[in-house]
Amino acid sequence: MGRMREVCGACSAMFMIAGILYGTGESFSHEDKTEHYKRIQQLAAEFKAEHDTIICRELLNELSVTSTPEPEKRTEKYYKVRPCVKFVRTAAGLLDRYISENPPQL
């Protein structure tokens, strides 16, 4: 996110949505927090199983990427070589399956 090339934005979104759906806000008990951290680590491990890492610069290692704040021009070529859509699909699929198997108590 923000071209810092740290945790993949798709993974960050997956973790934030899991927090919204399964978190208890400010009233996390120690046990709740432990369970939530397990959930996030499970989702991260499943993403890593498909792509080897959740780190953006490692996911994009075949591309010449920088961490400057100026975005690249969004050209047809940019979208042809950019693998980010694949990572968004993976994260969405993992979260969809997790939600289906573990319906949140809203």
Model-derived features: positions:
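Long, compositionally biased, intrinsically disordered segments
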Residues: 3-5, 10, 30, 51, ...
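Small-residue-enriched, tightly packed secondary-structure blocks
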Residues: 1-22
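Phosphate-handling active-site elements
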Residues: 20-39, 103
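C-terminal binding/interaction regions
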Residues: 36-106
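A short glycine-/small-residue-rich loop at the edge of a beta-strand within enzyme catalytic domains
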Residues: 2-5, 31-34, 38, 82
